């Protein structure tokens, strides 16, 4: 059985990156929640 986690920086950024979050209304909600919580890193 192959390992399921095959890291790729590009895929990571495209699905969980800042610009990906900003692209949708819900993504912006995620960022605002993380800002409110005081996260050092908002997105990947």
Swiss-Prot record:
The keyword Ribonucleoprotein applies. InterPro entries: Ribosomal_bL34, Ribosomal_bL34_CS. Keywords: Ribonucleoprotein, Ribosomal protein. One of its GO terms (biological process) is translation. PROSITE patterns: RIBOSOMAL_L34. The keyword Ribosomal protein applies. GO terms for cellular component: ribonucleoprotein complex; ribosome. GO terms for molecular function: structural constituent of ribosome. This is Large ribosomal subunit protein bL34.
């Amino acid at each position: 059985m192959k390992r399921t986690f095959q890291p790729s920086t590009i895929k990571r950024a495209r699905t969980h990156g800042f610009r990906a979050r900003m692209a949708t209304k819900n993504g912006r909600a995620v960022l605002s929640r993380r800002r409110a919580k005081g996260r050092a890193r908002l997105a990947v």
